[in-house]
């Protein structure tokens, strides 16, 4: 069994999340998703495990980039698997933004059937949850 090394710095955490993004993009999206900046910071919304910024707020090598954030409020409380599921969830939003597919309503809270279709087509199982729609 592979040995798992403990992550001890924010830089290591961000590098691990970026490596996960790259692997998921390759394996589930055929490398189609544009590069993003992954951040870890305190919650934008209470109860949100992560989010993607609609605006491209970052510049990297002269290119504008979206930001995917994993909420620092839950790091250490949630498993690695749950954190990767959050990353995959935000990647669904990225795919839909790139393809101009509206996947939420109610100020981005409710995840509609477009979100469900894209999620399931790219390896993320979702269920209908009260108040937020199709999510995980």
Name each model-derived stretch.
Residues 1-2, 89:
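Short, compositionally biased low-complexity segments
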Residues 2-78, 98-136:
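Metalloprotease/metallohydrolase-associated module, dominated by Zn2+-dependent proteases
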Residues 82:
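Glycine-rich, basic loop-to-helix element that forms the pyrophosphate-binding segment
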Residues 85-98:
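Active-site recognition of the HExxH zinc-binding catalytic motif
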